[in-house]
Curated annotation (Swiss-Prot):
Residues 402-546 are annotated as: Oligomerization domain. This is Carbamoyl phosphate synthase large chain. Pathway: Amino-acid biosynthesis; L-arginine biosynthesis; carbamoyl phosphate from bicarbonate: step 1/1; Pyrimidine metabolism; UMP biosynthesis via de novo pathway; (S)-dihydroorotate from bicarbonate: step 1/3. Mg(2+) 4 binds at E832, N834. It catalyses: hydrogencarbonate + L-glutamine + 2 ATP + H2O = carbamoyl phosphate + L-glutamate + 2 ADP + phosphate + 2 H(+). Mn(2+) 1 binds at Q284, E298.
């Protein structure tokens, strides 16, 4: 049926900030949906709270609201805009939950708004565990034995009947939040309590564990005419028991017989039809490896992480087509945008193998529990494509950017068989590497299968890789062996180490022997029809399908998988850079490996290469395309780290030169440059040994800030207050030597300022200056940023502008630069300069209207700032106040300390904007998930060094009617200041104590600052973790606390007795 003409305006709900379980895939799907609806002539209104996305660019929709995704704000937008319909199925779990809340509140009915795509009843049937189970029973579809529970007693009675292990699945949550596998009563109490707390409807499904079955996913589409197709089916290498977002996944499925494939396909189509879903849907199934028994695990009635993967794996743009189906078009009316000949009702066919490996944040959080279960922990993922599974897997391994080029990790070589067995059974992020190590050490496939029930097919593939390693080592210099190894995806890096040569020597050896990969096209139809997509992957085969044009081209390096410190902000900059290259008349080529992002949508660039970002893989593309040069400054540290090797290969780095990049990153060169420019910086030195570090710290004086050089996201950065902490850091956090020095700076407790600027070598243009609420010492990515600065004098602002211009010119920056300053005792010091795009680029671009990545790209391509209508100086400040607030995923990562410091911990960000700082802060805090009640109780436990400062804060909480709770030490200080306080027992007390208050939800805020000595077993750590587990806002920085107080005070009417007012006035008269 043709598209609907009875609706004109559609509100699309975004997915909000990036958190574990909901990452950049919704920027991709949301952007596609908005463009798709606009193509059909609808007016599109978008609401999302995340400024770091392409989706929230003003060009994506007709009207863009960057506001909190809460009932209060979304209702206000609906009442103001009066859309005809809302489309919530492209905004992840956030979008679905928002639609349910809007419907229940009555606002949709009040404003006559209908829900498109998937009916409310279908959302509830798929998301409500009880309704879903009933539907499956009606369809005669098997589900594991299960029970819906609302409290612990119901959980006990189910377990007594069915036995352990059981899986807990909370209703209406994201990424398995709050869920898990329980093997005993202790785990049952902990996980059920957590699950009920995280479910917005206080409901969990308890089901008998079917861990060990194969986990299969079907990505299906259906339209209003009941046409339904399977876009892609995927198989998890990890059996059931590990969340699919934490599983290694391959597409298409590799181990199903035709009968099994058709059986599960029919089930998936039957379910999507029964739910009446119009659009995309993801069905997760479990299959017993020894029979045809299967179970339906769950259904996501929306576009999901898996649909982003399926879209990139097949080239079939699910979100784009789901949006068209939502407005009434049918699959047999929509042309497949890939072939531009066939229709969307043709099921895609693949003649290659796709592998997805999750990217976990454990390199950032060494104390985190690495065990994988039903609650997701990965922040992002990589995808790779090969002609066989071995090639595909090894390409994915080297895409992870953990400095790994092969399926082996040195530290696993020491493991004995018993340890390997335990870790393979338990499943952690290194399981596949441990399986390979076990095979190297002679453990049989049968034993490994017994331990973890991984299919023999996958174990055989790992064994093939291990056997090939032996071949490579036994045949040094043999070209036939080299050819076979390359066909299996072995890297030059691995072969060089095995043959005792350099990577460059292997590369040259291959070129001399014409041993180079070809590029194949991703075309949705296994080459059955001609395809129009410029979307390629490399493989060692005969025919090359990537045709080089005679146009001048520029290569942009993407930023790889989403991880803490390098988020979707860099993808935003990459996409804008690609658009600018096209505007400037060049062919834009992008290399990236993240299936979740907008940059890997083949319609963005002229050519997309889905490849690992290693020197070998990038050089293959450059050798073929022979571009004018490569842009590295938008791909975060990933791309910057490739610059030197690319230049060694004779590749031109466009923009800031390698020498100047190095001058900003190398400590001694940077110091020399600052001295020459007369710009002050905190006293600091470089240490290459532990002894040197101790001597430097003594000379500078504690506290000192220590960090390795060349890092992103403050990795392994710490403030240390005394010598034993420094020794602990040097021993545990870094491996210091001449090539990897450690930087040691005096730690200045001052106001931190962040500046983004664009330089063309002559002119330096500054779109914005941001002030951080938390003082220096908290990583800029974890600070609340405010634009324009609220407390800087004009004199200090001028100093900052002068220093920025001097640095842009003095460091010969061509393109973007990001500078962090600290204001200490009314003097501006430079902390660091990053000669690249920073994570604040999208935020400032949206606020100021200056498309920073676009302008910087054109500068890099030779169009100076004046030609583009900008000059030297500071862009006029906006009237409104904008706040960038960090969002954390601590609830997903057990045993991680939530204290803020110089190492970045946030996964995403939101924006709040309004006419006053207080209102903007309120929006930013609410959007980031912090509840701001106007009354209640606050627990205060602070370190001795913070007691004095905490008194003023406590007094202000008391003034607005909050009840103060504190342990004996802090309580005594409060009583001495005549501030009423209730004493609570410390956490080691047998009686009712501080943790009980948090668990029972009797505190609205916990203020807890760090006591020195960082062992996680400490009291403070337990208080902070208990707060996170129970959803209580835990404030570890007094600066953040003050910001929240400002908001609370602005929301509270003053309530003083007349006597207090007259006393104050008399006091003022006396002192006048």
């Amino acid at each position: 049926m043709p598209k609907r003409l009875d609706i004109n305006t559609i509100l699309v709900i975004g997915s909000g900030p990036i958190v574990i379980g909901q990452a950049a895939e919704f920027d991709y799907s949301g952007t596609q949906a908005c463009q798709s609806l606009k193509e059909e002539g609808y007016k599109v209104i978008l609401v999302n709270s995340n400024p770091a996305t392409i989706m929230t660019d003003t060009a994506t929709a007709d009207k863009v609201y960057i506001e909190p995704l809460t009932l209060e704000f979304v209702s206000r937008i609906i009442r103001k805009e009066r859309p005809d319909a809302i489309l919530p199925t492209l905004g992840g779990q956030t979008g679905l939950n928002m639609a349910v809340e809007l419907a229940k509140s009555g606002v949709l009915e009040e404003c006559g708004v209908e829900i498109l795509g998937t009916k409310l009843s279908a959302i509830e049937q798929a998301e409500d565990r009880d309704l879903f189970r009933t539907l499956m029973q009606d369809l005669n579809e098997p589900t594991p034995p299960s029970e819906i529970i609302h409290n612990l007693d119901e959980a006990y009675s189910f377990v007594n009947e069915i036995g352990y292990p059981v899986i807990v699945r909370p209703a209406f949550t994201l990424g398995g939040t709050g869920g898990g596998i329980c093997h005993n009563e202790e785990e049952l109490i902990e996980i059920v309590t957590s699950g009920l707390k995280h479910s917005p409807v206080t409901q969990c499904l308890l089901e008998k564990s079917i861990a060990g079955c194969k986990e299969i996913e079907y990505e299906v589409m259906r339209d209003s005419n009941d046409n339904a197709i399977v876009v892609c089916n995927m198989e998890n290498i990890d059996p059931v028991g590990v969340h699919t977002g934490d599983s290694i996944v391959v597409a298409p499925s590799q181990t199903l017989s035709d009968r099994e494939y058709q059986m599960l396909r029919n089930t998936s189509l039957r379910i999507i039809r029964a739910l009446g879903i119009e659009g995309g849907c993801n069905v997760q199934l479990a299959l017993d490896p020894y029979s045809f028994q299967y179970y339906v695990i769950e259904v996501n009635p929306r576009v999901s992480r898996s649909s982003a993967l399926a879209s990139k794996a097949t080239g079939y743009p699910i979100a784009k087509l789901a949006a068209k189906i939502a407005v009434g078009l049918t699959l047999d009316e929509i042309v497949n945008p890939v072939t531009q000949k066939t229709y969307a009702c043709f099921e895609p066919a693949l003649d290659y193998v796709v592998s997805k490996i999750p990217r976990w944040p454990f390199d950032k959080f060494e104390s985190a529990n690495r065990t994988l279960g039903t609650q997701m922990k990965a922040t992002g993922e990589v995808m790779s494509i090969g002609r066989n599974l071995e090639e595909s897997l090894l390409k994915a391994v080297r895409s992870l950017e953990l400095g790994i080029y092969h399926l082996e990790l040195d530290h696993l070589k020491e493991l004995d068989k018993e340890t390997m067995k335990k870790r393979i059974i338990k499943a952690d992020d290194e399981r596949l590497f441990i399986v390979a190590e076990a095979i190297r050490q002679g453990v049989t496939k049968e034993e490994i299968n017994e331990w973890c029930e991984m299919d023999f097919f996958f174990l055989q593939k790992v064994e093939n890789i291990v056997n090939m390693e032996r071949e490579v080592k036994a045949n040094v210099g043999n070209m036939e062996v080299l050819q076979t190894a390359k066909e299996m995806g072995f890297s030059d890096h691995y072969i060089a180490a095995a043959w005792n040569k350099t990577e460059r020597e292997i590369y040259d050896m291959r070129k001399e022997n014409n041993m180079t990969p070809v590029f194949k096209m991703v075309d949705t139809c296994a080459a059955e029809f001609e395809s129009a997509t410029p979307y390629y992957y490399s493989t060692y085969a005969e025919e090359n399908e990537s045709i080089v044009t005679d146009r001048k081209s520029v290569v942009v390096l993407g930023s790889g998988p989403i991880r803490i410190g390098q988020g979707v902000e860099f993808d935003y900059a990459t996409v804008h850079s690609v658009w600018a290259i096209k505007e400037a008349g060049y062919e834009a080529i992008i290399i990236n490996n993240n299936p979740e992002t907008v940059s890997t949508d083949f319609s963005i660039s002229d050519k997309l290469y889905f490849e690992p970002l290693t020197i070998e893989d990038v050089m293959h593309i450059i050798d073929l395309e022979k571009p004018e040069g490569v842009i590295v400054q938008f791909g975060g540290q990933t791309a910057i780290n490739l610059a030197a090797k690319l230049e060694e290969h004779g590749v031109k780095i466009l923009g800031t030169s390698l020498e100047d990049l190095d001058r900003a990153e190398d400590r001694d060169k940077f110091e020399a440059a600052l001295t020459k420019l007369g710009i002050p910086q905190p006293v600091g030195k470089t240490a290459t040994t532990v002894e040197q570090a101790v001597a430097i710290a003594e000379e500078i004086g504690y506290p000192v800030l220590v960090r390795p050089s060349y890092v992103l996201g403050g990795r392994a950065m710490e403030i240390v207050y005394r010598q034993e902490e420094l020794l602990h850091y040097m021993k545990n956090a870094v491996k210091v030597h001449a090539d990897h020095p450690v930087l040691i700076d005096r730690y200045m407790v001052g106001k931190e300022i962040e500046v983004d600027a664009i330089s063309d070598g002559e002119n330096v243009f500054i779109p914005g200056i941001m002030e951080h609420i938390e003082r220096a010492g908290v990583h800029s990515g974890d600070s609340i940023g405010v634009y324009p600065p609220q407390s800087l004098s004009e004199k200090l602002k001028e100093q900052i502008i002068e220093h920025t211009i001097a640095l842009g010119k003095g460091l010969n920056i061509v393109g973007l630069l990001n500078i962090q300053f600290v204001v200490f005792e009314n003097q501006v010091y430079v902390i660091e300069v990053n000669p690249r795009a920073s994570r604040t680029v999208p935020f400032l671009s949206k606020i100021t209207g200056v498309p920073m990545a676009n302008v910087a790209t054109k500068v890099i391509l030779g169009q100076d700032l004046v030609e583009q209508g900008y000059g030297t100086g500071y862009h006029p400040e906006e009237k409104e106040v904008y706040v960038k607030a960090p969002v954390f995923s601590f609830a997903k990562l057990r045993s991680v300390d939530t204290t803020l410091g110089p190492e970045m911990k946030s996964t995403g960000e939101v924006m709040g904007k309004d006419l006053t700082l207080e209102k903007a802060l309120y929006k930013g805090l609410v959007a980031s998930g912090i509840n701001i009640p106007t009354h209640g109780s606050v627990i205060i436990t602070v370190a001795d060094k913070d007691k004095e400062e905490a008194m003023e804060i406590a007094k202000r909480f008391h003034e607005i009617g909050y009840n103060l709770l504190a342990t004996a030490g802090t309580a005594q200080s409060l009583t001495e200041q005549n501030i009423p306080v209730q004493v609570v027992n410390k956490i080691d007390s047998e009686d009712y104590n501080l943790l009980d208050i948090i668990r029972q939800g009797k505190a609205q805020f916990v203020i807890n600052t760090l006591t020195k000595g960082k062992q996680p077993a400490r009291d403070g750590f337990r208080i902070r973790r208990e707060s996170v587990e129970n959803g209580v806002a835990c404030l570890t920085s007094l600066d953040t606390t003050r910001a929240i107080l400002r908001v609370l005070e602005s929301m509270t009417f003053s309530a003083h007795s007349m006597k207090e007012i007259t006393q104050t006035k008399r006091h003022e008269v006396v002192h006048a």
